[in-house]
Amino acid sequence: MLLTFSYIPALILHLDIEKFSNTGKILYNLATDLAFLAILFIIYRKTLIKDWQNFTKNLGNNLEFAFKYWLVGVIVMIISNLLITFLAPNAIAGNEEAVRNLINQYPLYMIFSVSIYAPFTEELIFRKGIKDCIKNKYIYILTSGIIFGSLHVISTVTTPYDLLYLIPYCSLGITFAYLYTKTNNIFSSMTMHALHNTLTIGLYLIGTTL
């Protein structure tokens, strides 16, 4: 999911990214990431500026409110992951495994990609973008959560057990969508998404150094 946009310029320009050096791959992906961030900012600049001003006016309360909803989503994720571990003891989410491999290869780039790029782009697309298209609150929440979860899982499915990971990913997506409907402020879900991803990558990096 993180690197999807980077393939578009490569297809248009007929670039073979796999032939790039490691440094070349990082620079290419960083350039396309920054370009996509700029495009989304231009498209949603009015919403982003307005929501940022409103969010920072009462930053402490807004963060506390958003944190409570994120915590519920994390609890659901933990419970569902424990059930998956019980059913398939050696299983690991394909998306998580792919991200771990990339972290091992390009740690600094992946910290930026996971902690900043992904929350910004995914919240604007899966929360703001979908909400603009679907007016019914409940249909929007389910649609946003299911699409978010599916795109994090489907591309890495290799066994039927991998489909079980739709539950934790969709539950987190539903949590972020519900949070956005409650606050009508994209930074509520964006900050919690960034917190979630940063904690995840931080714990992984700490674990690999112990």
PLM region spans:
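Transmembrane helix-loop-helix hairpins at the membrane interface
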Residues: I78, L82, F86, N104-L210
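Alpha-helical transmembrane segments
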Residues: M1-T4, K68-V76, I141-I147
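Alpha-helical transmembrane segments in multi-pass membrane proteins
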Residues: M1-T47, N95-E97, Y109
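Structural signal for the C-terminal ends of transmembrane alpha-helices
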Residues: F41-D51, L179-T183
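Membrane-water interface of alpha-helical transmembrane segments
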Residues: K19-N29, E64, K68, K135, ...
